[in-house]
């Protein structure tokens, strides 16, 4: 079930297509993590002590950008929660939301392919789930 009017549940095939494209980009010989994977570490109004920020989650997991990239490659359709429109630009590619169990905790991941032609990926969220994971997820089990 989508969480708000800016979100939707895409078909399993559509999500699988997105994941296939994402994995192809991340595994491409031309993909350079430092240049092509944009991870938003802190949102404007987040507190530095908030355990649910991307920065603090990555620190708690002892992750760097390479580890985030590996987790993005490992996402499956069963991890899918919803698709969200980019509220800054509705014409831009949407974000796909996933929940992954990493080191016994659910991590909320919100990612999009920013530019397919140049292989740019934008991970706007990679943090411990602030709220319980919806259960079941659309294609879980």
Identify the residue ranges that each predicted region occupies.
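Compact soluble domain cores
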Residues: 2-13, 17-20, 24-92
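Phenylalanine-focused residue identity feature
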Residues: 14, 18, 31, 63, ...
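Enriched for short, Lys/Arg-rich terminal
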Residues: 113-141
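Functional cores of ribonucleases/endoribonucleases
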Residues: 73-120
């Amino acid at each position: 079930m989508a969480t708000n009017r800016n979100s939707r549940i895409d078909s399993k095939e559509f999500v699988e297509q997105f994941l296939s494209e994402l994995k192809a980009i991340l595994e491409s010989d031309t993909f350079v993590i430092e240049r092509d994977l944009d991870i938003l570490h802190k949102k404007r109004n987040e507190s530095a002590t908030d355990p649910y920020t991307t920065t603090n989650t990555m620190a708690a997991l002892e992750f760097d950008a390479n580890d985030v990239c590996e987790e993005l490659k490992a996402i499956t359709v069963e991890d899918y929660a919803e698709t969200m429109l980019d509220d800054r630009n509705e014409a831009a590619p949407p974000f796909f939301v996933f929940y992954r169990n990493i080191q016994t905790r659910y991590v909320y991941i919100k990612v999009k392919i920013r530019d397919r032609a140049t292989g740019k990926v934008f991970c706007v969220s990679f943090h411990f789930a602030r709220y319980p994971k919806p259960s079941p997820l659309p294609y879980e089990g």
